[in-house]
Amino acid sequence: MAEKVNNFPPLPKFIPLKPCFYQDFEADIPPQHLSLTKRLYYLWMLNSVTLAVNLVGCLAWLIGGGGATNFGLAFLWLILFTPCSYVCWFRPIYKAFKTDSSFSFMAFFFTFMAQLVISIIQAVGIPGWGVCGWIATISFFGTNIGSAVVMLIPTVMFTVVAVFSFIALSMVHKFYRGSGGSFSKAQEEWTTGAWKNPHVQQAAQNAAMGAAQGAMNQPQTQYSATPNYTYSNEM
């Protein structure tokens, strides 16, 4: 088997850093989980873009007469939350769907609930916290309408991220409970060390892939397009 080379994040060649993770949805994730895993990845991307737009909104806030603290914190949130959210909640759910690991699911639930709370706080927008939420934006309309309109864009985006995060958490929890997952299974994986054993993880991944392929390749009853009628010669 060829060695997997880290390919994420895809950094430009002029940056003297190498990718830290290997990510290949089609190769790692079973087909039945592929769609949900990609949606969570897109949610992470949306959250990252929202943090970047929030930086622009805080710059408009600063230009319009707001304090420099918000702009500084917005920059900090961008460089801090973008990689941390990927490592802390997306990688666990990626690994959970890849290896069917209850421990990884629990790690995702714990960190993603924190992400949901943060998203709600960002959407609310407490002044001085470095986010253009509803309170900060609405209150700034009386000071500078132009800046407030720019601030309204990340405010709406933070709200969308919060709503999508709640939906995503509900979908993953519904799947996990429906598949028979539980906290006791996560404790068992932690006790036995199965959550960090590469051989156990590979076996679980192969089993999941095999089950998915078996379901897809299951023969189905073929029916003729031409009806066949049988007549009796008895009167």
Swiss-Prot record:
Give the stretches traversing the membrane. 40-60, 68-88, 103-125, 149-169
Instruction: List the cysteine pairs that form cystine.
Output: none
A Gene Ontology biological process in which this protein takes part is: positive regulation of cytokine production
Superkingdom of the organism of origin = Eukaryota
GO CC terms in record? Golgi membrane; plasma membrane; recycling endosome membrane; synaptic vesicle; synaptic vesicle membrane; trans-Golgi network membrane
Specify where it is mainly localized. membrane
Localisation: Cell membrane; Golgi apparatus membrane; Golgi apparatus, trans-Golgi network membrane; Recycling endosome membrane
Q: Which segments sit on the Cytoplasmic face? A: 1-39, 89-102, 170-235
Q: How does it sit in the membrane?
A: Multi-pass membrane protein
Keywords, alphabetical: Cell membrane, Cytoplasmic vesicle, Endosome, Exocytosis, Golgi apparatus, Membrane, Protein transport, Synapse, Transmembrane, Transmembrane helix, Transport
The record's tissue-specificity note reads: Brain-specific.
Q: Does the keyword Cytoplasm apply?
A: no
Which segments sit on the Extracellular face? 61-67, 126-148
Function noted in UniProt? Required for the calcium-dependent exocytosis of signal sequence-containing cytokines such as CCL5. Probably acts in cooperation with the SNARE machinery.
Homology family: Belongs to the SCAMP family. SCAMP5 subfamily.
Record's protein name: Secretory carrier-associated membrane protein 5
Q: Which organism is it from?
A: Mus musculus
Mind giving the lineage of the organism this protein is from? Eukaryota, Metazoa, Chordata, Craniata, Vertebrata
Corresponding gene?
A: Scamp5
